[in-house]
Each structure stands twice: as structure tokens, then as C-alpha cells.
Amino acid sequence: MSNQSQVMRTHGKTFFWASWFLEREVSNRLYAIYAFCRRIDDLVDESNDEVELSKNFYDVINAWENNEYHHAFEEFKGIPRNYLPREEIIKEFLKGQASDLNHHQPKNINELLIYCYRVAGVVGLMVCDSMEIKDKKLKYFAIDLGIAMQLTNICRDIKEDAERGRIYLPINIIKGLTTENILRPTKQQLIDINQARDRLLNRADLYYESGYQGIEHLPKKTARSLKIAAQLYQAIGKKMIKSKKTYLDGRIYLNKLEKSLISMQIVLRRNNINATKIHNHLLHDSIRKLPDSHNKCCLLYTSPSPRDS
């Protein structure tokens, strides 16, 4: 087993499970992307302050621009440059990671979605780059899938994040509750936070359903693997709601039987090659100015806005 795949097996069990359904060449590129993201995450953890982190990230970008060695790119060795992430996408990812060092709770859903784009939506774009996908619409859907998965992560890790002094639930949704409130809530606060969690999970479903439209237009094996990963993540969110457990009851996981059933359903299902490629531009209202986002209105789509009232 390669070092890259071992990193994913250890830290990203859902993705590792789904990767078994990919062709070896494609899975190796995705392992490399995942390992790169983990290395950047380690750089954040190793930095003592914003000044040191800025220097570390400058070194990363400088090495990339000048095609020089940097240990962050160790896993990219042997992969042709045309399959690697673009510089502007790497920069957006670094911005997202840097925001975790000097964490500020998002004021509203718009700020949260920008964060989700930078730490996960751009990973969808990295995957597009690794497959040489040029279709702009497919990139819209890739962003949506990344955002959906990050929203699921946030909802699953409410307690763990609070223990680290971080809150990703927007201020205007949880009415200014603190980490202390989250870790030791009153009965009403517990209800309010669980309702906020479920509200975000329902929003994540909008992004999942959009992402699935793009998956249908990918090569069969790639589509199958990505759909398995996405549906496993989405199933975690649905299990959170259905179980009636609170965020204090511990992280929700899927067992092997649940993973197997979902995977087999997808393997046995045919791709819907006639799936629409009309993207709901309203999903990108908050990120419209960021790379590869949908920044023009699509008049053919008349779905109601997903924005909070």
C-alpha cells in the first residue's frame, strides 16, 4: 500500500472505502490530493502564530510557482503537471486553512459557505484538475459536493470543535451561544443547537443533490466511486437526524453493513446519462466572486432560492 493511500486509510475512511471502486491511476491521483491536504493541515498545526503560518504558506506557493521541491508536494512526485491542482485553487485552499488558525465564528450562512468553499469546495476542483475536467458546469457541481461534505463534517463535529475553541455554526443561527454553552448547554440551548445542526444538514442536502447531477456525466467508474463517497457522507447526516441523538452523544458513524448496502445500491444502478446539467446559480450566491464558481444567472432554472429567510 502506498504512503498516500495509507494516509487516506487512516484519516479518511469514507474516501478510502470509495476509492476501491476507482481505476488505480485515478485513485493514486486522489490519494495524492488527500495527502497534500493533510500535509497543509499539519503545517497549520505546527505554526505557532499567523506570522509563522504566512511564511510557511509563502514557501509553499513560491515552491509551486518556481517548480521547486517542498515537502507539502511530496505526494505529487511522478504525477504529470497537467493532472495537478492549479495555483489559484491551492491559494484558496491555503486561505481556508489559515482561517482555522485565527478562528472567527461565521456571522451568517454566507460566511460559512465561503469557508466551506475554501476548505472543501476547492478540493472538488482539485479532483476536477486531476481528471482534466474543463467543463465549467461540472466544476460548479464539484464545488457543491465539497460544500455539502464540509457541512456534514461541521454538523458531526460540533462538540469536538467546541472543545478546541471553535464554533462553525453561524452566530445568527445559534444566537451568539459560546463554546461553554455548547459543551454545557441548558435544556433549551441543547434543543436550539440540535435544530441549528439539522437546519444545516438540510441545506447540505441541496448541495448534495446538485453535486449528483455532475457526477452522472463522469466516466462510469469515477462516477460510481464519487457517488459512493458522497452518499456515505450524506447518509451520516441523515442518520444524525433520524437517530434523534444530540451532538453531545458522540460522533455518528456508518457501520460496515450500512456502507456495504449503500455501495451495492450504487454499483447496481445505471448512470443517468440524461441528467440535467443546469446548475442552480443561487447555490453560489455567497461564493460568486471565487474561482470557478457560478457567477452568472441561469435563466433556465427557476428553483426557489435556498437562502435562509
Which stretches of residues belong to each language-model region?
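An N-terminal structural lobe/cap that precedes and organizes the functional/catalytic core
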Residues: 6-52
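Active-site alpha-helical segments that house and flank conserved acidic catalytic motifs
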Residues: 28-46, 139-167
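N-terminal, motif-rich segments that launch catalysis or mediate targeting to/interaction with membranes
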Residues: 43-107, 113
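Divalent-cation-assisted or electrostatically stabilized phosphate/pyrophosphate-binding catalytic cores
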Residues: 51-62, 166-203, 254
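Helix-hairpin-helix/helix-loop-helix acidic hairpins
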Residues: 106-141
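Glycine/small-residue-rich hydrophobic helix-like segments
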Residues: 188-239
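Acidic, carboxylate-rich catalytic segments that either coordinate divalent cations
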Residues: 260-300
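Single conserved hydrophobic/aromatic residue that forms the stacking wall/gate
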Residues: 301-309
